């Protein structure tokens, strides 16, 4: 079962509507920008996160990409949500500088690594394997992980988030060959549900990620 936006609580609905208004006509590729925000929220849901992290998922780009100010976020949604949003807001003249700025703020507010992982995972999963965006994320990944990998390192849920992102960005991370033989056999036989279950078992992932892995295998 996918993430159901109809089940958001009042505070998250407020955050979603606020972001929808703030981003206006902005696009995420060919799609309305809310598509990306919903994808980030869905990744958090896959790992059981909600509350302030859920609110921050909808709001994480409003300070960086719209006229909304940090003060507005704090006044409307509180200090913790602002701290999460501000930590992942990159400030600087170019991408490298913005990344470094965000890394330093996330290190100072470690809980924000959960939000940043969800954001990067959603971006990577939305990028075709051979696209320039995927190439950029793969190039950045060693530095990204060197800065943020030590944060909340003892948290098993955060570790699983890293595993999901690593699988997406590192082509060398894959299921053992014998498992792929069985998965490919099931796909060839038209046993999609069984192939999906085999991918979930091999990668210890949810149905959404398993569908992406199968789609790339096709």
Question: Language model features by range: what are they?
Answer:
Residues 1-177:
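Active-site helical microenvironments for divalent-metal-assisted chemistry
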């Amino acid at each position: 079962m996918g993430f159901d936006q109809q089940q958001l609580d009042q505070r998250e609905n407020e955050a979603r509507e606020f972001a929808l208004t703030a981003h206006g006509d902005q696009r995420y590729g060919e799609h309305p920008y809310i598509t990306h925000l919903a994808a980030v929220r869905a990744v958090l849901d896959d790992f059981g996160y909600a509350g302030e992290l859920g609110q921050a998922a909808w709001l994480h780009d409003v300070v960086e990409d719209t006229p909304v100010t940090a003060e507005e976020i704090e006044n409307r949604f509180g200090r913790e949500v602002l701290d999460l949003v501000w930590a992942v807001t990159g400030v600087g003249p170019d991408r490298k500088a913005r990344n470094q700025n965000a890394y330093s703020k996330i290190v100072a507010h470690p809980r924000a690594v959960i939000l940043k992982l969800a954001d990067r995972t959603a971006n990577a999963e939305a990028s075709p394997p051979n696209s320039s965006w995927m190439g950029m994320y793969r190039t950045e990944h060693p530095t990204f992980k060197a800065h943020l990998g030590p944060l909340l390192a003892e948290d098993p849920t955060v570790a699983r988030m890293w595993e999901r992102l690593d699988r997406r960005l590192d082509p060398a991370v894959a299921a053992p060959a014998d498992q792929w033989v069985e998965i490919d056999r099931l796909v060839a036989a038209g046993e999609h549900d069984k192939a999906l279950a085999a991918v979930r078992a091999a990668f210890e992932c949810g149905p959404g990620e398993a569908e992406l892995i199968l789609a790339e295998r096709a």
